[in-house]
């Protein structure tokens, strides 16, 4: 039972970190997610959620750096690529974001990532991001 329990600790830290994020307890979330990342360096999930904590605070440049660091190790993680695009949209970098979103949709590797990318792309097209305006081509 000891080894089986120990193997679950990183997953539990990720879940607790995500829960703290949803509750707005961002410092607690970051501490839990960093612990999970240290125990599971091969898993992009804790660091992707870490980027979400920065995004939640409006620290879009820090979220971007965090997502890019994840993608340096996990280049095809389309969910992280979608969150990166969201951080670019928040920084009004429409062209970069739209290209990234389209690449996620075109790759079609991860259903949740594709749905998120399509939703963000549709919002850009409808001009829901201030200053983005509808696409002209």
Language-model features: locations:
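Alpha-helical segment of the N-proximal tetratricopeptide repeat
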Residues: 7-35
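Start-of-helix register in tetratricopeptide repeats
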Residues: 11, 45, 79, 112-116
